[in-house]
Amino acid sequence: MMSGQELAEVVQIAVEDLHPGHHPVVLENHEVTEEDLSPTLKRQRIEINCQDPSIKSFLFSINQTICLRLDSIESKLQVLEATCKSLEEKLDLIMNKQQNPVQVPVVAGSPLGATQTWNKVRCVVPQTTVILNSERQTPGVTKLEGREESINSSTETLENMLNSAVPGRRHNTIVVKVPAPEDSHNDDDNDSGSEASDTLSNCGNSGNPNMGNNVTLITLNSEEDYPNGTWLGDEHNPEMRVRSPITAADMLHISTNCRTAEKMALTLLDYLFHREIQAISNLSGQGKHGKKQLDPLMIYGIRCHLFHKFRITESDWYRIKQSIDSKCRTAWRRKQRGQSLAVKSFSRRTPSSSSYSTTEGVQNTVSSSSDLQQTSPQALHYALANAQQVQIHQIGEDGQVQVGHLHIAQVPQGEQVQITQDSEGNLQIHQVHVGQDGQVLQGAQLIAVASADPTAGVVDGSPLQANDIQVQYVQLAPVAEPSATAQAVEPLQSALQPEMHIEHGSIQIQ
């Protein structure tokens, strides 16, 4: 028989087995001893024996995913570090590059040029990388400024270069890579410069490390350069436009008649560069014949205009540049053979580059007549109808364009005054009768011959410039028949010249 104490212990053990999570129930007659007190809580020891393969594969996949993430982060950091180093090297190249500008003569305008930019020297065909002035820097330069102090100093030096190279009225500067001199060593009939300049247009994708050592700046012009000109490119985008001396009437004529991008490019080339300039120049300014470089700003303007008007691609622009260089080579060969370099389309029409303005400032468009086609192709022709001022462009022996104005005090109603400038620089003033339909009724009659007087005068209270000419006449001579026009030119010239005298710096006809 069990004793009472043993029986109580057995019952206590049975109760504990039934309620493992609860405190043991102590019987009333059970005496609590030290052995009955529960030991202090200890960390449960669990023996891990993972024999399930699914748990192992799950843990392995988690480990593999974490490793892949870490590898991806590491590769991105390496790419970022390489990009920062590349940008730092480019900034160092820009900072250390010292380009001495070479003056490139450019005669621009219609028909034989309207401006001469000797003081605006820029480099070759630009690309899409643009750095604005200090107020609007590119985000890449701004980020680099916050990275290291050395890059900060490089950026400040670059900004100083921009400010020193750009006059106060200019705002945008383009960073351009230029082909090295050793890149162009073919003869002139084969090298066009377009291959090198095409590399410039795509220098962001180029892997040639030698191209990175030739960097220069191109300064975009503003409306102040050519107040009477027009924009090439998108006039609403200051980074994709160039101010040109082409007038609005000429630009309308070009846009109307040029249906393809290549034809428009070659037409704009004739308006912007005289054939004499084309003959001694090309796009790259390199070659064995010592050719000069076409004004890269105007070439960039042509590029912007074609991209804006025709949505051309870089491959199209590469082909057009080859055509431009081919046109320059053709002009060079014609000059070597002694052939004429005149633009036929310009000699058959009245140039709209001349400014026709009335006293109220209204511009009038004058249509060309058949008489203008019969005159010498060496002379510049201007027709004036119901206006009081005509602008004269004359190209000097040095290639400079001299601009003057011819002031006429009064024009008889229903008549036109045709001003012809001969090869010697003298002005021949003719009277032309024009019908209501715009047709010339009778041939032009020479009424005066005048030369420019550098002395200043006054016309209606406005001072004359140095190259201005004032012609006053009270009564015009009777108009001769068309058949007798040629015979009447010389007698009229000799008869009218004694009646001309200079008074207060102006040439007057009595």
From Swiss-Prot:
SMART domains per record: BEN (SM01025)
Keyword Oxidoreductase recorded: no
GO cellular component: nucleus
Annotated region (Disordered), positions in chain: 178-212, 343-371
Listed Low complexity bias regions: 348-359
GO biological process, one term: chromatin organization
Entries under PROSITE patterns matching the protein: BEN
Alphabetical UniProt keywords: Cell cycle, Chromatin regulator, Coiled coil, DNA-binding, Nucleus, Repressor, Transcription, Transcription regulation
Molecular functions per Gene Ontology: DNA binding
Coiled-coil intervals: 68-100
Biased amino acid composition, Polar residues: 193-212, 360-371
Keyword Transmembrane found: no
UniProt subcellular location: Nucleus
Residues in BEN domain copies: 239-335
Free-text function comment from the UniProt entry: DNA-binding protein which may repress cyclin D1 transcription by recruiting HDAC1 to its promoter, thereby diminishing H3K9ac, H3S10ph and H4K8ac levels. Promotes activation, which causes cell cycle arrest.
UniProt record similarity statement: Belongs to the BANP/SMAR1 family.
The protein, known as: Protein BANP
Organism: Xenopus tropicalis (Western clawed frog)
Lineage of source species: Eukaryota, Metazoa, Chordata, Craniata, Vertebrata
Gene name as annotated: banp
